[in-house]
Amino acid sequence: MIFANHAHVFPEDIKPSGTIDNLKRLMDDCGIDKAVCFAPFSDRFEECGRTDTPNEWLAKAIKNEPDLYGFGTVDFTKNLRDEVDRIADFGFKGIKMHPPYQEFDIDGEDAFKVYERAEELGLFITFHCGMHWHRLKGVRPILYDEVGWFFPKLRFSLEHLGGYHFFNESLAVMCNNSRGEVRPRVFAGWTSVSDCEGIDAWTLTNEQLETIISQTGDESSMFGLDFPFHGAEYIKYEMERFNSLNISDTAKENILGETLRKVLGV
């Protein structure tokens, strides 16, 4: 079974290429069985004048989609504990957080409120990890070590694992949080790391991908789509690339779905 993380989905009036139907077509084309869908960030709904919330929309959109699992979004202008509670009430498995885009500090007081409640409720968090055209001071990957330190039962993924610029820093966070009662709890998100379109901000080499496995083990990595920002050819290339790496068959199975399945309990 192939189970992919990291699909950004949208109502058609906000981003036509990012609809649930288009995601399902891509999954069929690529042979992907299940996927995690992220609710859009709240500013996208506000810009379009929608009266529903992103989490309300996503809950309705995937209600009858047994192969799609929801991750909610947090609106930092609202009561954060209530925001996380509503995400759990919708039956979502986790939260998508993007420090540069949402403009919050990884180790900030507001963010810690989200982590605390997510830990209490057993929600997984998928973080953007790496540069994204925002001041780096509050969003450097090393700050995720603070999340691991203060919330030892919280499970989360570092998507792109820092990318081209912050790979070693992100890997250090994973390795530094590899002990404790909950293991593994910091995961590498193998998302948008391809070299098929040249070297960009999130590209990782085969050697770096193999290093993730050798340093953190077979059960700490998971594959992500970054839909709709990549199409079927890109996704197929990545899946073939991962299967060609000099790592165990067990590691490959885990990357392409088994780790995510276990983490989310589905």
Residue ranges and their predicted role:
Residues 6, 27, 35, 58, ...:
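Divalent metal-coordination and catalytic microenvironments
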